[in-house]
From Swiss-Prot:
Belongs to the cytochrome c family. PROSITE patterns: CYTC (PS51007). Electron carrier protein. The oxidized form of the cytochrome c heme group can accept an electron from the heme group of the cytochrome c1 subunit of cytochrome reductase. Cytochrome c then transfers this electron to the cytochrome oxidase complex, the final protein carrier in the mitochondrial electron-transport chain. The keyword Magnesium does not apply. Gene3D superfamilies: Cytochrome c-like domain. InterPro entries: Cyt_c-like_dom, Cyt_c-like_dom_sf, Cyt_c_1A/1B. Heme c binds at residues 19, 22-23, 85. It comes from Neurospora crassa (strain ATCC 24698 / 74-OR23-1A / CBS 708.71 / DSM 1257 / FGSC 987). Its main location: mitochondrion. Binds 1 heme c group covalently per subunit. This is Cytochrome c.
Amino acid sequence: MGFSAGDSKKGANLFKTRCAQCHTLEEGGGNKIGPALHGLFGRKTGSVDGYAYTDANKQKGITWDENTLFEYLENPKKYIPGTKMAFGGLKKDKDRNDIITFMKEATA
């Protein structure tokens, strides 16, 4: 299974409770504990200016889209061994679909 469009409102709530403490979405939001996510879709891993990525993130060599995020957000440390992202992941497909749908709207 891969990504399918979800509920943006539910995704916004998930982002607020699971992601916002470490990431910003808005343009010019800047890096926090994690890199800024504005413009995420279509961007290569490990490429936000001013953020200190691990070599694992820089060398992963993928471009973020709905399907790569769907896989990554299930278990970040499995998808990119060596990432410093401490988040354990979203195990439910529906939660990942909702948050990706929201992020796609919020980071465009």
